[in-house]
């Protein structure tokens, strides 16, 4: 979809969601995802040996979805969907695989390594 259209945009680092934006014309709404997503991204960057800004910037992408209904509600609905769809274990596996969903099944991860991913839990 062209920028400036009515859409919900999911900002991704590789295959890990980072943020949800919605826009209708000039009106915009931004929803920050929970901290577990940022912690998974940080861990995936370390696993993938991404240390420079240039390397990091090349990994970001956006997914455009049609805007259905109210701007704020649509953004929050997508953020809630992502939060429920990406469990701590799924994010941990993604982080361990360097952020690529396609590599998750090919990456052997032990139960101990999964337990070490408790840092992805939110402290609420």
Name these PLM-found stretches.
Residues 7, 40-48, 75, 93:
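Charged, low-complexity, helix-prone segments enriched in Lys/Glu/Asp/Gln
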Residues 25-63:
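Acidic, aromatic-enriched beta-alpha/helix-loop junctions
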Residues 76-124:
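C-terminal charged interaction modules
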Residues 1-28:
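Short, charged/polar N-terminal "headpieces" of proteins
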Residues 51-93:
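Helix-rich interaction surfaces within compact, conserved domain-sized segments
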């Amino acid at each position: 979809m062209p920028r400036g259209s009515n859409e919900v945009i999911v900002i991704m680092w590789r295959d890990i969601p980072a943020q949800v934006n919605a826009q209708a014309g000039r009106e915009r709404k931004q929803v920050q995802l929970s901290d577990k997503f940022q912690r998974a991204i940080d861990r995936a960057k370390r696993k993938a040996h991404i240390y420079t800004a240039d390397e990091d910037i090349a990994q970001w992408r956006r997914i455009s979805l049609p805007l259905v209904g109210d701007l704020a509600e649509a953004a929050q609905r997508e953020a809630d969907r992502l939060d429920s769809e990406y469990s701590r274990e799924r994010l941990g596996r993604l982080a361990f695989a360097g952020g690529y969903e396609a590599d998750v099944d090919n990456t052997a991860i032990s139960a101990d390594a999964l337990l070490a991913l408790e840092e992805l839990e939110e402290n609420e």
